[in-house]
Amino acid sequence: MSIIRSERYSAIFLLCSAALAIIFANVLDPDTWHAVHSAVSEYHIFGLITPHDIVADFLLAVFFFAVAIELKHELVKGELSSFSKAIIPGVCAAGGILVPISIYLSVASVLPNGWPVPTATDVAFSLGILAIFGSSLPSKVRIFLLALAVLDDLAGIVIIATAFSVSISYWWIIVACITVGLFGFCSYRLARCKTSKTFLIIPAMLLCALAAWVSVYQSGIHATIAGVMLGIMLNRKQGAAIEHALEPYINGIILPAFAFLAAMVRVPHLPLDEISPALWGILLGLLFGKLLGISVFGIIALKFFRKKSISFFNLLVVSALGGIGFTVSLLMNELAFLGTPVHEQGVIAVLIGSLLSAILAIILMRCYKGRKSKSLPGTKGRVSH
């Protein structure tokens, strides 16, 4: 379990899942691929839900449940608990959203649905890359990246809830609010009841959570929002333990499974003039939009508020890591383009943009390590391994 909890191995699992998916999709002949794709996306288990929806709607709701727990902790007692702590990551997060959107719309204005795709940061992947290659960086870089990613996730939640909601059923929304409220009440009671009574409250919480998910799923709002609502309503005392318990399943099963399904596309053989502008918009938005948005807005905020919370070089590292959209960007791409010819090109753009951002971040971290080695006494001329 300790390996699966590791940020390093989480990033490796995600990368391997995406790579295997692309290989799998492209070695199959077209007929077999079509049959597999139809089985995953069109076959309804018991006539209720497809395997794709189980992963993208149900399992990802569990991931967003954990994200909401982390977000609540950071807002109440963590790195976002006060204005002075939150202002620099907040400005950086705003820049990391606004600039990629601007780049995307300037390049792909004919396909405006895709503007949310380059706004996301994959917290698991970016922290994993930092853990593998950034061991020589100060610990505050991880804290800053985590705060930035949490705010990015918050923005992503708002985007999913507003931009990708269709045919809203207010009746189901009312039912969802009631069940989420009951979940919160049960959580409150669980924190204060005797151990002997927990066997009654825990099943009630699970039933309320399932009912809330079904209600949101039926409401027209993306079902992952159910996980967010439940995570926010969970009693803070229980949050850390539940998040810790879910961590190996999220890192080892849920995120790799979604990465595999989302990246399972056939690479089209297209001439340059047939490449969708959405591909360029997403790619440039992730690679350059995130880098410029986070770093430029961050520099302005540091100067304006006279803060020294992070150095310019470390801010560049965080900016590059912010361009690793991966799983969350793949989700946004599905919501924006699934069922259209642009979808596969969007997946390729997310994967290439995230990979190039990761490579840029690794180069910057290696430069920092080399510079640090030269500055230490007695290390002149040594090769840093």
From Swiss-Prot:
Disulfide bonds: none annotated. GO terms for molecular function: sodium:proton antiporter activity. It catalyses: Na(+)(in) + 2 H(+)(out) = Na(+)(out) + 2 H(+)(in). The chain crosses the membrane at residues 9-29, 45-65, 87-107, 114-134, 155-175, 198-218, 220-235, 245-265, 282-302, 312-332, 345-365. Keywords: Antiport, Cell membrane, Ion transport, Membrane, Sodium, Sodium transport, Transmembrane, Transmembrane helix, Transport. It comes from the Bacteria. It is a multi-pass membrane protein. It is found in: Cell membrane. GO terms for cellular component: plasma membrane. Its main location: membrane. One of its GO terms (biological process) is regulation of pH. The keyword Cell division does not apply. Na(+)/H(+) antiporter that extrudes sodium in exchange for external protons. Belongs to the NhaA Na(+)/H(+) (TC 2.A.33) antiporter family. This is Na(+)/H(+) antiporter NhaA. The lineage of its organism: Bacteria, Bacillati, Actinomycetota, Actinomycetes, Micrococcales. The gene is nhaA.
